Amino acid sequence: MLNITEEQHNIEIQQNLRYWKKKPLLTKIYKIFYNLIKENINFSLDGLIVEIGSGTANLKSIIPQAWCTDLFPNTWIDQVENAYHLSFPKESISNLILFDVWHHLQYPGNALNEFKRVLKPNGRIIIFDPDISLLGFIVYGLFHHEPIGYGQEIKWFAPENFNYKDFGYYAAQGNANRIFKSNKYDEMLYDWKRILVKHITSISYVASGGYSKPQLYPKSFLPFMIFIDQLLGKFPVLFATRLLVVLEKKSN
C-alpha cells in the first residue's frame, strides 16, 4: 500500500486541475482517451452514466451527461461516492466508468459486487488503467510515485471487519494487467462478460509528461506522435502503456 493519506490524494487532485489548465497538449491526449471510452458506452440502455473516482471531472468534456463522483466534495463533482458502498438504487446505472481508478481498488471483489448491484442487466463497466508492457514497466515503475505492485497479493475480498469509511490509500498500477490479461481470475469474474481487453500504445501520452512531469514535445507535434503510436502499437507487449477493459453484467 502506498503510504500517503487520502487528504494528500485530494491535494494531488487539486494540483492536477492546475496542470490540466496549463497543458493544452495533455487536454488533447485525454480527449482521445475519453473518446475511446465513449465508443464503448452502451447508449441503448436507460439509466445513469456514472464515473467513479472522477478526480477533476474532465470526462464531461467528451461525455457531458456523465455523472461524476469522487470521495471528495470538490465543487466540480456531482456527488460524493465510495466504490465499496454506492448510494445509487439497484439496477439504476447503465454504464460505470473507472478512469485510473481500478488500480486503487484494494478489494476488487467487494467493488464488483457493488457495481453488479447498481448496474442494469447488460450494463457495462469501462476500465481505463495502466498497461504494464516492457515500456509500461519502465515508465510506471521508475517514473511514477505509485507502485506497480507485482510482488503483492491481490486480495479479492476485504476481511469481515472491513469498514468502507475507514481505509488507507491503496495503489497497485499493475492490477488491471494481472487480472484481465490472464485466465487466473475468470472464476471471480463469473458474473461478467469480458467484452474487450485492448492494449493501447500511447508514447504521445508518456512524452507529454502527464500532469506533473516535463513535456517533451510541442503540441504541434501531436499528429506525428500519434503516427508513432500507431506504428509501435503493433507490438503491445513492448510498448502498450494503457489498458482498456469493458465488462458487461450478465443478464441471467
Where are the model-predicted features located?
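A conserved beta-strand element that flanks and buttresses the S-adenosyl-L-methionine
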Residues: 97
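Short conserved loop adjoining the S-adenosyl-L-methionine
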Residues: 85-90
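Short catalytic micro-motifs in class I SAM-dependent methyltransferases
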Residues: 100-101
